[in-house]
Amino acid sequence: MRCFRWWLYSGWWWLTFGCARTVTVGFVAPTVRAQSTVVRSEPAPPSETRRDNNDTSYFSSTSFHSSVSPATSVDRQFRRTTYDRWDGRRWLRTRYGNASACVTGTQWSTNFFFSQCEHYPSFVKLNGVQRWTPVRRPMGEVAYYGGCCMVGGGNRAYVILVSGYGTASYGNALRVNFGRGNCTAPKRTYPRRLELHDGRTDPSRCDPYQVYFYGLQCPEQLVITAHGGVGMRRCPTGSRPTPSRPHRHDLENELHGLCVDLLVCVLLLALLLLELVPMEAVRHPLLFWRRVALSPSTSKVDRAVKLCLRRMFGLPPPPSVAPPGEKKELPAQAALSPPLTTWSLPPFPSTRIPDSPPPPYQLRHATSLVTVPTLLLYTSSDIGDTASETTCVAHATYGEPPEPARSTATVQECTVLTAPNCGIVNNDGAVSEGQDHGDAVHHSLDVVSQCAADTGVVDTSE
């Protein structure tokens, strides 16, 4: 049972840490692994160009950290930095043009999905534009996070996550169309896509004039400011739609990458089952489970499972288990192993009490060398030289039925003591050898008299 628990815990740990993180499919917006890049597209006011303490690099690979020139720097180095900054901005304006357009239309969608964003370079921060207040104070930058993705209908468009790296309402998006000409509304800065390749920027392969703002709860939540920034506000009461279910094609794209992981998990489960289930259950399943159903059970769960197996195979129910109590011995066992209170001592006085009960009647008949039953005579350990117990041939009943009268030859056989260290007693009552102690002579005479009385023969030697 402990081995089975160990295998169970090992398998649970294997599946949890091997497959849990790969099998779980989250129904949330894809996480954008963005690489922040700041691109300057508008020059600072002339009054601030000479002593611009907030000078930033053109392409910062992490974020827009300011690199301030030291006050003690050489004037020539400052002029070169200013020239490079102006030259870089002029290069951006001549290549990409002004990033200003007007909003020509919007469309709200509750069943929007996109995919294949990872087939392009890492996501970048889009068109960060430094803005200034009327008193020549920097307002910050307008930044967008997103990428060129495949949207519904097989077209590629730019998708912006309005919530940054956080989760978003699945399926809700607002499409905003920008235009460069025939603008009745004021022009605003729109998110222009710049892809970063080895330090250089390339225009987006998606249409920059059609942008999807993904993750909104209602169309009124998005506000495009006059500077082209994106503002967020609360949705009106009752206008918040429920998030739609994930689209079928989007789920297929998410599950496509899990096929190999699921196959590995299935192989791990198969190996675990091969370790737990014996091969006999695979080769002969009917015989194996039938044998399991017929085997005795100890626990309640094991008994319930085997009862179900018996019902499946049409076997009779298992016998009822007796309540725990005192074990009752059978009559045969009680006769073979009597309790300690029924043991009887030898019928004559002895100087040593036996340490163990006498053997049964059948055992004494099987181990004796003569046909007459034997009796163990226990004497003092001071009498014998090597053996502490002397065995003499005599007749004892111990509850056996009395035997019929025997002939004189049988009496002569009873009077002969053949055990070692036991003197030979003649009919005259003399001890030839061995016994020097007086008690032993009296014991021998008593045994001979008892033997003669039992056989019914009268001693006529006197």
Curated annotation (Swiss-Prot):
<keyword id="KW-1133">Transmembrane helix</keyword>
<feature type="transmembrane region" description="Helical">
    <location>
        <begin position="12"/>
        <end position="32"/>
    </location>
</feature>
<protein>
    <recommendedName>
        <fullName>Uncharacterized protein HHRF4</fullName>
    </recommendedName>
</protein>
<keyword id="KW-0812">Transmembrane</keyword>
<comment type="similarity">
    <text>Belongs to the HHV-5 US29 protein family.</text>
</comment>
<feature type="transmembrane region" description="Helical">
    <location>
        <begin position="257"/>
        <end position="277"/>
    </location>
</feature>
<dbReference type="GO" id="GO:0016020">
    <property type="term" value="C:membrane"/>
</dbReference>
<dbReference type="GO" id="GO:0033644">
    <property type="term" value="C:host cell membrane"/>
</dbReference>
<keyword id="KW-0472">Membrane</keyword>
<keyword id="KW-1043">Host membrane</keyword>
